[in-house]
Amino acid sequence: MKISTSSANQQQPAKINIRPQLALDAAFKQTGSGVEIYIERHGQGKKSVEGSQLKVHYEGWLAEDYKMFDSSRMKRRPFEFELGKGNVIAGWDIALKDVRQGTKMQIKIPAKLAYGSQGVSSMGIPQNADLIFKVEVLKVS
């Protein structure tokens, strides 16, 4: 399928922001920190604790306009990190503690637990941006 453009000689696809399929706001559980979590599927594997090595697939969007800013699936490479060591944004360390391998979840993270007033211009994340992630926990070790 081709997307029409203003000039017949230029065949460039239009840029479209597509809202991710997310649970209704009421389905999310609030944590005391302000992170909100919705479990799409409970995993049956090993449970994560501080210091666990996690391998995940994720997609991240700006909460304001649903613009995707990053995806391990698009990179075709899972992301690995050690939980609770400050190697990821604080919202991830909070949300991914005590989850089991195989879990699929959605996470809403307030700016203060993401990139805060700094933002990350190279990724298209403005200052004080709330973020939304879909995360699948592939491995806990």
State where each predicted segment sits.
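Cross-family detector of peptidyl-prolyl cis-trans isomerase
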Residues: M1-S141
